[in-house]
């Protein structure tokens, strides 16, 4: 991955008195899958709309492939495949007719047979009228229209919304394939397991502020692990005072079982245990969801 595909610098957006984006700084690398995490109202959709000049920020600068969306909105839109989060498809088109219409409007379009193959993979019947489709099938049409052109960037706002688990997985497979072919993927989601499966890096947004950005694996690895140790005999003298990343949560009365938190690397912790008669060691590694919830707790511990 080289170069910058998307750059936001000190971006602010107000809706009346509501400060939706609060000085957002963000860089997305060319060719990566960037997962943008946050619940409804955090600022995910507002960010994407600003990047496409569908709405305009009050302050700050945005560049997509080096272009300013406010000065070159048509050029930016031509280089981006976009799936909106509030997708609304109406009218007398069939799904096939709609996709053919979009294909005529776009340059550098994908082979029609390739689109048919994608439709088959996500189990979409193309000859029904859009107005008669379920919301899940409308979502599939929306995904396909974002794939009509071969573009360097895709912006997908909640791409698996309304889909069943099998179709969600297939959509993620398609997204990964596009990235493998060099496309930069920026996708927002509130479904943590999806982001964990495919994102190279993750940004967590809370109330319009980017509170964390990191490699997905790095974010999980540096989180707090929970370890439960069972000893073959009582170990009343177990001492972790020399390790600043260990916090003892619970010790059984017979001193045969300990529950601890281990922050960051595990090497020193494991070496300390080598001096004791360990029967069993269980380590719970947090999911991305648990990491995410840590960032979303306020000062009272409430989410």
Describe the residue ranges of each PLM region.
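ABC transporter nucleotide-binding domains
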Residues: 3-8, 13-206, 210-212
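Structural motif detector for alpha-helix initiation sites
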Residues: 30, 95, 216, 285-288
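Short acidic active-site motifs
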Residues: 72, 215, 268
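ABC transporter nucleotide-binding domain
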Residues: 172-261
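Short, charged/small-residue-rich alpha-helical element at the C-terminal edge
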Residues: 225-299, 303
């Amino acid at each position: 991955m080289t170069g910058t595909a998307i750059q936001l610098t000190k971006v602010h957006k107000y809706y009346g008195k509501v400060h939706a984006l609060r000085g957002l700084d963000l860089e997305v690398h060319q060719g990566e899958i960037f997962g943008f995490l946050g619940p409804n109202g955090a600022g995910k959709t507002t960010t994407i709309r600003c990047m496409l000049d569908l709405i305009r920020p009050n302050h700050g600068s945005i560049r997509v492939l080096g272009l300013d969306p406010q000065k070159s909105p048509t050029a930016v839109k031509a280089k981006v495949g976009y799936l909106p989060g509030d997708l609304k498809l109406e009218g007398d088109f069939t799904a096939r007719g709609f996709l053919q219409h979009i294909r005529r409007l776009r340059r550098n379009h994908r082979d029609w047979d390739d689109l048919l193959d994608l439709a088959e993979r996500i189990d979409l019947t193309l000859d029904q009228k859009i107005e008669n489709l379920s919301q899940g099938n409308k979502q599939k049409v929306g995904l396909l229209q974002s794939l009509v052109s071969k573009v360097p960037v895709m912006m997908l706002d909640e791409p698996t919304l309304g889909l069943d688990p099998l179709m969600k997985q297939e959509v993620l497979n398609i997204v990964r394939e596009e990235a493998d072919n060099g496309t930069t993927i920026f996708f927002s989601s509130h479904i943590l397991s999806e982001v964990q499966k495919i994102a190279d890096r993750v940004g967590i947004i809370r109330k319009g502020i980017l509170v964390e950005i990191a490699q997905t694996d790095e974010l999980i690895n540096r989180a707090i692990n929970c370890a439960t140790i069972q000893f073959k005999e009582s170990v009343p003298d177990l001492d972790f005072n020399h390790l600043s990343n260990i916090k003892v949560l619970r010790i059984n009365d017979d001193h045969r079982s300990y529950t601890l938190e281990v922050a960051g690397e595990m090497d020193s912790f494991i070496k300390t245990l080598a001096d004791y008669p360990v029967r069993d060691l269980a380590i719970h590694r947090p999911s991305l969801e648990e990491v995410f919830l840590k960032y979303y707790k306020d000062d009272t511990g409430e989410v």
